[in-house]
């Protein structure tokens, strides 16, 4: 009788822990504070690059229209411009010098991931961009169910999930958006996209 009581107590503790983790994950926005922008080894103000200089997303994130991940640019991509452009402020010059030093010493830049997905989930950027930029598809809806007025270009497609990156000093998940499974399923449903488990889960 005593071993059964001990086993029952252990099971209760384990189940309580699992329930607590699930509740924290569900009510955190996003889970465990991961939505806060992580600090990066080099400051990269999208406001300067995208809003002021009109550099398109796919110039730096070259894989975004071709594969699963958007990927961060290689140092060589940064030097395409910053071999000659020093930056307008002392702070900008210091950050650009970090890029040049990384290139000169053949040291990769250890960028911190901003958007995290569980290992069992895949998000194929190319498929989303192909769908939203396809002009032969009629009405399309954004992540919150808002009707998109026309087929967006690549940069506008990025804003559907990432928010207005051009006006963000620091990239972080879209304001008020946790990008949980339900968010993805809702967007798939409103756009009549399959919601089979295997579409997004490995």
Task: Describe these PLM feature segments.
Residues 33-34, 112-113, 176:
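Short secondary-structure boundary/capping segments
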Residues 13-17, 28-32, 48-51, 92-97, ...:
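N-terminal start-of-chain detector that recognizes signal peptides
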């Amino acid at each position: 009788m005593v071993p059964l009581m001990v086993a029952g107590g252990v099971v209760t503790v384990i189940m309580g822990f699992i329930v607590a983790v699930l509740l924290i994950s569900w009510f955190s926005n996003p889970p465990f504070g991961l939505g806060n922008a992580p600090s990066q080894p080099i400051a990269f103000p999208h406001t300067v690059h995208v809003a002021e200089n009109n550099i398109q997303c796919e110039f730096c994130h070259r894989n975004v229209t071709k594969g699963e991940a958007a990927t961060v640019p290689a140092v060589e991509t940064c030097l395409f411009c910053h071999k000659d452009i020093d930056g307008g402020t002392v702070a900008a010059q210091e950050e650009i010098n970090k890029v040049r030093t990384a290139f000169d010493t053949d040291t990769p830049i250890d960028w911190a991931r901003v958007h995290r997905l569980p290992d069992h989930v895949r998000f194929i950027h190319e498929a989303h961009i192909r769908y939203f930029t396809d002009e032969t598809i009629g009405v399309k809806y954004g992540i919150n169910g808002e009707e998109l007025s026309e087929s967006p270009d690549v940069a506008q497609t990025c804003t559907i999930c990432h928010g207005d990156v051009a006006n963000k000093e620091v990239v972080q998940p879209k304001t008020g958006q946790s990008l949980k499974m339900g968010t993805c399923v809702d967007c798939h449903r409103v756009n009549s996209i399959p919601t089979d488990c295997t579409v997004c889960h490995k």
